[in-house]
């Protein structure tokens, strides 16, 4: 596929995305914008011969009864038009209609969801844990697809945590929303064969509460609940593909991934579970690796985090390891993560882009496909990537997801209990940063985006987000 005038295409996409944010989704989106309530009319004395007030559903553009050319949908007003759209959803392109998605680490997401998942937001931006990872099926191996995520409010409420009852309570109406953002997977667009080849990880995605963020991070309001949405967009090669924008994407919602955005963890059980299940919470875990059961030792299960960062998006996982310089930088980033959240991230080189497709813990996943629904500059390399020095362990010739157990042993210390989830082994690979132009600070721009995919992505975009809250105390998420 040949792409030209990348900057102009990206500017066009940014404009179309912003213009499409307020448009209704073509399907039944429970988290989309709601139609304002119909007007209320004060009762008044009827005047003989005078027409009465129009019915509420007919406001404000209902034709008179029996008017020529009026249809059932028109006679019921805009609300019924939307209801008709729900009854007759847009027929999806066969390239996306057969796509299905499985959520990885579903058991871990379920455990967090039962407690009430919390995700840290900071001014500098913070990565999610658990990381959103999926396995894709049913794509056309030779067709091009883009993968993106956005976040929509679960409701219009603001919450507070009641420590005496260990529960979340409604604190009032939600804060004003700002135009939403979408996050593109850094390998977009790519062939369906590549996407289906291995597990896709959105470990570059960062959450922030900085309303003035210019790094393309997802802006959220602290103490509000959000639902992540995952979108598959077919890159339509037709010249008039804008006409089919609503047909060329498919949206998936996993309800177990919803969370409350916070500046510091409120529920101590969430804190404990994140420490126990996050292999990089080394400064806070109180168990000795020698006390671990054999099946809970690092390396006993496949990788959770990212690997195979290279210029070639379909590079083999048997590529050489990263350099000593990469390893030192990754270690320094992790050491910063072990400190207080208020310290924030160190300054990173601008326009840093790393390609990532990663394997993860296998597990069954449910999905809720929606018929409708929908970035910015990429953040620095994932803190979860811990690179080894070359030759630190045997090559990965036997299995692409097999990683040495020794990689995590030095991250653990003290004594007590084993973690409830196995900590995976990890072998890193060198990544190659790419300079990347920016066309709009509110959207992620990838050099391989054409107008066809832009139109489909714009149709898929329908989000709200923003936040501003003071930095919190300690937290243990990877950045």
From Swiss-Prot:
What happens upon changing residue 299 to S? Does not affect transcription factor activity or nuclear localization
Q: Which UniProt keywords apply?
A: Developmental protein, DNA-binding, Nucleus, Transcription, Transcription regulation
Tissue-level expression: Expressed in skeletal muscle, lung and testis. Highly expressed in hair follicle stem cell, but not in terminally differentiating cells.
Which spans does this entry mark as compositional bias, Basic and acidic residues?
Answer: 323-338
Q: Which InterPro entries match?
A: p53-like_TF_DNA-bd_sf, T-box_DNA-bd, T-box_sf, TF_T-box, TF_T-box_CS
- Coiled coil ranges (UniProt) are none
Q: Name one GO cellular component term.
A: nucleus
Entry GO MF terms: DNA-binding transcription activator activity, RNA polymerase II-specific; protein homodimerization activity; RNA polymerase II cis-regulatory region sequence-specific DNA binding; RNA polymerase II intronic transcription regulatory region sequence-specific DNA binding; sequence-specific DNA binding
The entry's localization annotation reads: Nucleus
Q: What do mutants without this gene show?
A: Mice die at birth with hypoplastic and intermittent missing craniofacial muscles, cleft palate, absent thymus and parathyroid glands, as well as a persistent truncus arteriosus (PTA) with a ventricular septal defect (VSD). The first arch forms in but the distal pharyngeal arch fails to become segmented, thereby explaining, why the pharyngeal arch derived structures are malformed. Conditional deletion in the skin epithelium leads to delayed tissue regeneration due to progressive depletion of stem cells.
Q: Which stretches are tagged as biased composition: Polar residues?
A: 313-322
Keyword Transcription listed:
yes
Q: Which residues cross the membrane?
A: none
* Organism superkingdom: Eukaryota
Biological process terms from the Gene Ontology for this record are: ameloblast differentiation; angiogenesis; anterior/posterior pattern specification; aorta morphogenesis; artery morphogenesis; blood vessel development; blood vessel morphogenesis; blood vessel remodeling
Function (record text): Transcription factor that plays a key role in cardiovascular development by promoting pharyngeal arch segmentation during embryonic development. Also involved in craniofacial muscle development. Together with NKX2-5, acts as a regulator of asymmetric cardiac morphogenesis by promoting expression of PITX2. Acts upstream of TBX1 for the formation of the thymus and parathyroid glands from the third pharyngeal pouch. Required for hair follicle stem cell self-renewal. Binds to the palindromic T site 5'-TTCACACCTAGGTGTGAA-3' DNA sequence.
Q: Summarize subunit and interaction data from the UniProt record for this chain.
A: Binds DNA as a dimer. Interacts with DSCR6. Interacts with NKX2-5.
In its UniProt entry, what is this protein called? Answer: T-box transcription factor TBX1
Query: What is the protein's species of origin?
Result: Mus musculus
């Amino acid at each position: 596929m040949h792409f030209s005038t990348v900057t102009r295409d990206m500017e066009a996409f940014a404009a179309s995305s912003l213009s499409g944010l307020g448009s209704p989704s073509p399907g039944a989106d429970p988290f989309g914008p709601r139609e304002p309530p119909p007007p209320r009319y004060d009762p008044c004395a009827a005047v003989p011969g005078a027409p009465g007030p129009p019915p509420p559903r007919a406001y404000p553009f209902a034709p008179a009864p029996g008017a020529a050319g009026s249809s059932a949908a028109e006679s019921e007003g805009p609300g019924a038009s939307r209801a008709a759209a729900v009854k007759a959803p847009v027929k999806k392109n066969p390239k996306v209609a057969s796509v299905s998605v499985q959520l990885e680490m579903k058991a871990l997401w379920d455990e967090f969801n039962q407690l009430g998942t919390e995700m840290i937001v900071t001014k500098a931006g913070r990565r999610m844990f658990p990381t959103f990872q999926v396995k894709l099926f049913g794509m056309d191996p030779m067709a091009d697809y883009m993968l993106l995520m956005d976040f929509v409010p679960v409701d219009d409420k603001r919450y507070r945590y009641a420590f005496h009852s260990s529960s979340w309570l409604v604190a009032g109406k939600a804060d004003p929303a700002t135009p939403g953002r979408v996050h593109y997977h850094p390998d977009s667009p790519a062939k369906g064969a590549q996407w289906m080849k291995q597990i896709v990880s959105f470990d570059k995605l960062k959450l922030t509460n900085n309303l003035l963020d210019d790094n393309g991070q997802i802006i959220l309001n602290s103490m509000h609940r959000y639902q992540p949405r995952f979108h598959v967009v077919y890159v339509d090669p037709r010249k008039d593909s804008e006409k089919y924008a609503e047909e060329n994407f498919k949206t998936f919602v996993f309800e177990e991934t919803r969370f409350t955005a916070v500046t510091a963890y409120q529920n101590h059980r969430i804190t404990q579970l994140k420490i126990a299940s996050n292999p990089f919470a080394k400064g806070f875990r109180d168990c000795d690796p020698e006390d671990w059961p054999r099946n809970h030792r690092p390396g006993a299960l496949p990788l959770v985090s990212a690997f195979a960062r290279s210029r070639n998006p379909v590079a083999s996982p048997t590529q050489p390891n990263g350099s000593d310089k990469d390893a030192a930088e990754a270690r320094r980033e992790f050491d910063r993560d072990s400190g207080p959240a208020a310290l924030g991230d160190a300054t990173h080189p601008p326009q840093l882009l790393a390609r990532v497709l990663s394997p993860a813990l296998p597990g069954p996943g449910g999905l809720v496909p929606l018929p409708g629904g929908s970035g910015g500059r990429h953040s620095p390399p994932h803190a979860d990537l811990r690179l080894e020095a070359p030759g630190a362990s045997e090559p990965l010739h036997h299995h692409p997801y097999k990683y040495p157990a020794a990689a995590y042993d030095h991250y653990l210390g003290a004594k007590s209990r084993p973690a409830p989830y196995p900590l995976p082994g990890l072998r890193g690979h060198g990544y190659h940063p790419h300079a990347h132009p920016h066309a709009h600070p509110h959207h992620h721009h990838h050099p391989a985006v054409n107008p066809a995919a832009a139109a489909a992505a714009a149709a898929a975009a329908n989000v709200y987000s923003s936040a501003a809250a003071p930095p919190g105390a300690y937290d243990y998420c990877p950045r």
